[in-house]
Structures are given as structure tokens and as C-alpha cells.
Amino acid sequence: MRWEEKDIITEAKKSGFKAIPIFTKDFYSAIGVGENYSELEADVIIQRNTSHARALTTSLIFEGWNYNVVNDATSLFKCGNKLYTLSLLAKHNIKTPRTIVTFSKDKAVDLAKKIGFPAVIKPIEGSWGRMVAKAVDEDILYSFLEYQEYTTSQFRQIYLVQEFVKKPNRDIRIFVMGDEAPVGIYRVNERNWKTNTALGARALPLKIDDELRDLALKVRDIMGGFFLGIDIFEDPERGYLVNEVNGVPEYKNTVRVNNFNVSSYLLNKLREWIKK
């Protein structure tokens, strides 16, 4: 278990909840066979699987057994697929980085010229900045696309290329819990253009203004889900751009720099939700 899962269990005990960890290696679904996890007594299942595929699958199974799951499988699918995320946000007039998606390497390079270089290539699914690369010209972009083609990803021949947003050396992560956006951080990296904390970015406290809060809650309405981490870029000309949405967000550094108890806040919001 990560720090977050341990903290949820600790805070649950303090709040009077009975927290029961469920490990994927022990989990099973026995359809038409007999005893299974569907007999577990629980008001809510908090989805904290580190694997997107396992998170999506276990949420689907628990929902099939009529459990309340946070987050539900539909919102996890929307968040886990970057193309789906961007398409939904664009449909609802939420500003995002300019993006192209093609099934041809040559077409991807040709369209990338309209976005301009440097350009960013990223996988349709993935986290922690893995397989995300910056191409400074056409030749390098083609090489990255060619490399992707020979990976084992199911989306290896779907090419997603984005503009390189000229943001400060930071991005923003806003946490939404239920109908509130109570806390966020700046993720700052002076040595790498990627601002994932998993890649060395520093977390700094963020004061959420009304514009950011309204934007985060609009994204929540579009994506669904109960507990989201929303990643936002600051563009010098276009303002806030929503880059990605995380359906199983990590928050250890957010707690540390803000002195804000995310686990306790989440559990209290879940208590309110269960009582409705």
C-alpha cells in the first residue's frame, strides 16, 4: 500500500469507519459459482488501485454487485483515456492544449507543423509521465512515433501529439471531493519540463481562486466521479488549460505542504454522500 491508502485506513478508524483493505491479488469474481466478494458488507468501495486496468475492472465488478464505488468505472474510463478526456472537455468548451490524433505517422508529422515545434507525444493511456516525450523537430517526432509503433501498447498505432504549452516551470493540481474543490498544489520543476512529482517536481501550496474552483467543478461535472485530481496548465495567452484528469489521485505531497488532511476530508464528504 502507498502512503495514501495507509492514511485512509488510519483516518477511517479515527472517524468511526470500519476500513477493510481489499488487495487485488486476493480479489476474485465468481459468476454463477458461489461465494465471492459480493457478500462483503460495505457502504462504499474506495478505488485506490495503482493499475488503471485493475482499477477499471474491479470498479466494474463491484458496481455489478450494486456497491457504491468511488470512483465508478465510467469516470475511471473517461479519466484513464486521454483522448476521451480531451474530447469531452472540448465538447463542453473547456480549454485544453491543442491536440491532434491520427493513425498515420506521416499525417501526425504533417499536422504537427500546424501546432508548431516543440511538440509533445504522449500515449492514449498512462500515468506518471511515462512515454511522454518532447520533439523539437519533425525528424525527432517521427522517431518517437516510430518507437511507439513497436511498443506493446494496444494504442501503439494511434498517435496523439500536443502543442508544447509555454507554461511557467510548474503546473497546477486541484483536488475535487464531492461538490467541493478544497485544496491544490503547484508542481514546480526547474530542471525538467515535466512537472510530475513522480519525476522530481516539488509541491508548493496553492491558493485556489474562484476561477480555478469554478473550472475544477465544471470538469468534475463533465467527467463524473467523486474524488478527482485535475491537472491544469497556465498559458500566458489563453489562461488556464486543462491537461489531464486523474481518477485515482495521489496526495501525500499535497497534505505535507498544505497541512490539509485530504483523507479525513474525503471520508467526511463520503459520509455526507452515503447519508443522502
UniProtKB/Swiss-Prot annotation:
Annotated knockout phenotype: Cells lacking this gene require lysine for growth.
PANTHER family for this protein: COENZYME GAMMA-F420-2:ALPHA-L-GLUTAMATE LIGASE, RIBOSOMAL PROTEIN S6 MODIFICATION PROTEIN
GO MF term (any one): coenzyme F420-2 alpha-glutamyl ligase activity
Enzyme class: ligase
Motif (N-[TS] motif that is essential for LysX substrate specificity) on chain: 253-254
Cysteines engaged in disulfide bonds, as pairs: none
Taxonomic lineage of the native organism: Archaea, Thermoproteota, Thermoprotei, Sulfolobales, Sulfolobaceae
Positions annotated to bind ATP: 82, 122, 126-132, 162-173, 187, 196
Pathway: Amino-acid biosynthesis; L-lysine biosynthesis via AAA pathway; L-lysine from L-alpha-aminoadipate (Thermus route): step 1/5
Described purpose of this protein according to its UniProt entry: Catalyzes the ATP-dependent formation of a covalent bond between the amino group of alpha-aminoadipate (AAA) and the gamma-carboxyl group of the C-terminal glutamate residue in LysW.
The family this protein is said to belong to: Belongs to the RimK family. LysX subfamily.
Domain ATP-grasp: from-to ranges: 86-271
Species in which this protein is naturally found: Sulfolobus acidocaldarius (strain ATCC 33909 / DSM 639 / JCM 8929 / NBRC 15157 / NCIMB 11770)
Subunit structure, as described in the record: Homodimer.
Protein name: Alpha-aminoadipate--LysW ligase LysX
